[in-house]
Every structure is written in structure tokens, then in C-alpha cells.
């Protein structure tokens, strides 16, 4: 992609298990036919958790993963700026079972549309400045908790006890301190989770408008 081509960056934030990944993947799949398979991509904020390979597993488990300090937003900002300039980047790969980055990376080439999704995207003014549209998934916390328990136990090798403990100690408090207040920076607030068809269509139309502007 040349520097003359616009790169539209859309950020989708909200609580853990609020439907961010679902709505991001839905928009991705439905827009590919319009913009081209190789011209739209998704970046997950989780990939930018800081490398903790120098820490013991016991120390890694104690990290507050719902606090902005756990994330390498410096690198994420750098990668978004590079993609906007037409340069490819190496997106880190994060292991939920090892609680650190792996040695693998995924090459992302420049795109016309980049969809970002993550819990703390709207808390960082540098990231907000790079986004052309911002979305907040306003899903009730009790629903998020049920989804999180199911996901983390089935997909991330967690126990129910550890998931509930983390929710009480860090997930909910950090949501109230950082994530919920960041809702004020959203252009679009989406209720009822990632299957909200009207919200999906509105987002797709807005992205199409941004591509034409």
C-alpha cells in the first residue's frame, strides 16, 4: 500500500468478554468482499502484553493484566504508525497459558482497514489519536463474567476458581477505574454484545464512508 492510500483504523474497546472479538471478526468477514481479502486486518491488544519471559511463572501469575501498565502500548502505537506509512510489522504472539510472549510473531502487511480490539484501547490518548473511529461494547458485567468463565476454562486452561478470583481482585476493579471511564471517548456505544446487527451495519457503513473521504 502506498503512502497515498488511506489506512482507516477502528478501535473496539470494552470489558473482557463483552463481545469485542465477535463484532471485530464479523465486520472483518463481511467487509473482506468489499475492500479485498488482503486489505483488511484485525489486531488484538492482548498480543501487546509485555514480555515476561524473565519472570518466574509464580511472578507472572501475580501480574495485573487489567492495568494499562501490563501492556506495551508504545510498541502498538509504533506498529500502527508504521502500517499507516505503508510498512509491514511483526505482531507479537502472546500465550495465555505461559503468561508471556512466545518467540513467534505474525507478519502484518499494510491494510486499507485495521480493526483493533482490546479492553484498554481507549485509555491511551496516543492510541485514540491514531484511530479514525472508536467503539465501546457496553455489555452488562454479569454477562461478561459468565462468558469469561466459559471462555477461560474451555480455551485458556484456567480453573473456575482462578477466573473468579482474578475477576474479584483485578478485572472488576480495573474495569471501574479505567475501562468504564474510557467509554466517554467512544464515537459509537454498542449495547447487547457482539451480535447487535444494527450496530454492525452502522459500523460497516461508517467505515465505508471513511474509506471514501
UniProtKB/Swiss-Prot annotation:
One of its GO terms (molecular function) is ATP binding. One of its GO terms (cellular component) is cytoplasm. InterPro entries: P-loop_NTPase (IPR027417), PRK/URK (IPR006083), Uridine_kinase (IPR026008), Uridine_kinase-like (IPR000764). Gene3D superfamilies: P-loop containing nucleotide triphosphate hydrolases. It is found in: Cytoplasm. It is an enzyme of class 2 (transferase). One of its GO terms (biological process) is UMP salvage. CDD domains: UMPK. Signal peptide: none annotated. Keywords: ATP-binding, Cytoplasm, Kinase, Nucleotide-binding, Transferase. Its EC number is 2.7.1.48. ATP binds at residues 14-21. It catalyses: uridine + ATP = UMP + ADP + H(+); cytidine + ATP = CMP + ADP + H(+). Pathway: Pyrimidine metabolism; CTP biosynthesis via salvage pathway; CTP from cytidine: step 1/3; Pyrimidine metabolism; UMP biosynthesis via salvage pathway; UMP from uridine: step 1/1. Its main location: cytoplasm. Belongs to the uridine kinase family. This is Uridine kinase. The gene is udk.
Amino acid at each position: 500500500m502506498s503512502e497515498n492510500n488511506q489506512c482507516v483504523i477502528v478501535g473496539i474497546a470494552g470489558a473482557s468478554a463483552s463481545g469485542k472479538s465477535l463484532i471485530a471478526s464479523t465486520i472483518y468477514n463481511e467487509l473482506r468482499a468489499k475492500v479485498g481479502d488482503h486489505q483488511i486486518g484485525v489486531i488484538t491488544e492482548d498480543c501487546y502484553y509485555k514480555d515476561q519471559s524473565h519472570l518466574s511463572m509464580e511472578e507472572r501469575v501475580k501480574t495485573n493484566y487489567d492495568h494499562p501498565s501490563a501492556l506495551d502500548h508504545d510498541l502498538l502505537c509504533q506498529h500502527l504508525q508504521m502500517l499507516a506509512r505503508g510498512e509491514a510489522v511483526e505482531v507479537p504472539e502472546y500465550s495465555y497459558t505461559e503468561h508471556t510472549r512466545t518467540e513467534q510473531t505474525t507478519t502484518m502487511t499494510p491494510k486499507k482497514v485495521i480493526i483493533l480490539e482490546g479492553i484498554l484501547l481507549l485509555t491511551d490518548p496516543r492510541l485514540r489519536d491514531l484511530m479514525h473511529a472508536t467503539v465501546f461494547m457496553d455489555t452488562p458485567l454479569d454477562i461478561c463474567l459468565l462468558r469469561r468463565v466459559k471462555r477461560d476454562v474451555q480455551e485458556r486452561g484456567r480453573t473456575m476458581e482462578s477466573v473468579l478470583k482474578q475477576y474479584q481482585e483485578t478485572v472488576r476493579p480495573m474495569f471501574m477505574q479505567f475501562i468504564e471511564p474510557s467509554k466517554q471517548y467512544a464515537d459509537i456505544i454498542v449495547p447487547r454484545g457482539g451480535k447487535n446487527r444494527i450496530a454492525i451495519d452502522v459500523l460497516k457503513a461508517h467505515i465505508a464512508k471513511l474509506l471514501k473521504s
